[in-house]
Amino acid sequence: MNKIYLENDESTNKLGVLISERLKEINKSTIEIHLEGDLGAGKTFLARSIISNSGWSGLVKSPTYTLCEEYDLGDVIFLHIDLYRTDEPEDIHIFDLDRKTHLKKLIIIEWAQKLAIKRNFHLKISFEHFEDGRKVLINDNDELFSSLIKHYE
């Protein structure tokens, strides 16, 4: 696990740009990213940055009330999920995350710490308020994002 410091929205957006660039290079049919942290820690801001910098030109809405927003970019589909308002462990099953698709599937789960049944992830980012910015722990489960981590060393 690696720790970095994000001082402001600009540095958080830069992390989103780096992740979106790496996502384009990874040759996997499904990539899952888990985002954890308190309210206002930067989870949704980072998810918006990743999706926008991957080619989505429209509004990236927070899925806090809808639970899931889908973004079809033609060859890639993003499933942006927010578990903040979920109470039941089975709530995650309604999204059918493991469904087969001809598109590359990129799953971003906010409040992943609320998952009752742990799912495999490729990247987990945990936000923590620190001074005027954020301390961020990055867990690259299978080293697909090692270049991202090296950028901050």
Which residues does each PLM region occupy?
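Phosphate-binding P-loop
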Residues: 22-30
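Switch II (G3) loop of P-loop NTPases
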Residues: 80-87
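Short phosphate-coordinating micro-motif centered on Lys-Gly-acidic
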Residues: 90, 95-153
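P-loop (Walker A) phosphate-binding loop of NTP-binding proteins
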Residues: 36-38
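Short hydrophobic/aromatic beta-strand immediately N-terminal to the Walker A/P-loop
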Residues: 32-34
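N-terminal pre-Walker A segment at the start of P-loop NTPase domains
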Residues: 1-22
